[in-house]
Amino acid sequence: MKLMVLQLLLWHSALWTVHEATPLGPARSLPQSFLLKCLEQVRKIQADGAELQERLCAAHKLCHPEELMLLRHSLGIPQAPLSSCSSQSLQLTSCLNQLHGGLFLYQGLLQALAGISPELAPTLDTLQLDVTDFATNIWLQMEDLGAAPAVQPTQGAMPTFTSAFQRRAGGVLVASQLHRFLELAYRGLRYLAEP
């Protein structure tokens, strides 16, 4: 049944162009090896992000992202949408575009956190590399499917953290947002991976 629904969604997506990309045709689907690798990458990035949050909590007592929400708005930390990847409204081409765009956004946010603290730098570097690897994996799959936009996205304005506290609070907020983003991505990818 899910295969029929997915094929119907793919057929429907062939009628519309999304983000200047060629939609996937009804006979195309994502390779199982790609989906499994993506699920593995999501789990790895979530573990990296959780480690960053735990270390910020232990070292700087920044343990509750919800307490920092007002600061998120004043710092201008954007959130990435992933509405096209929900199982109810799954649009494969749009989902891949949103997933790549979100990962690209989080690459920039993690780069903006550079200098957070010497003891957290290795954790942040690992997280950054894993997000970059996942974004590259998504982009290459989009190219293989002929669904990649003609031009790769460019990084928009990123927040400027002017103090050590802002950088650390930003680290908690970015890691928390990335975790929520990846939870949605994981659900969508797991739905696609089911036979």
Swiss-Prot record:
Disulfide bonds join 57-63, 85-95. Residues 1-21 form the signal peptide. Keywords: Cytokine, Disulfide bond, Glycoprotein, Growth factor, Secreted, Signal. Gene3D superfamilies: 1.20.1250.10. Granulocyte/macrophage colony-stimulating factors are cytokines that act in hematopoiesis by controlling the production, differentiation, and function of 2 related white cell populations of the blood, the granulocytes and the monocytes-macrophages. This CSF induces granulocytes. Transmembrane segments: none annotated. One of its GO terms (molecular function) is cytokine activity. PROSITE patterns: INTERLEUKIN_6 (PS00254). It is found in: Secreted. Monomer. Glycans are attached at residue 154. O-glycosylated. This is Granulocyte colony-stimulating factor. Pfam families: GCSF. One of its GO terms (biological process) is positive regulation of biosynthetic process. SMART domains: IL6 (SM00126). GO terms for cellular component: extracellular space. Belongs to the IL-6 superfamily. It comes from Bos taurus.
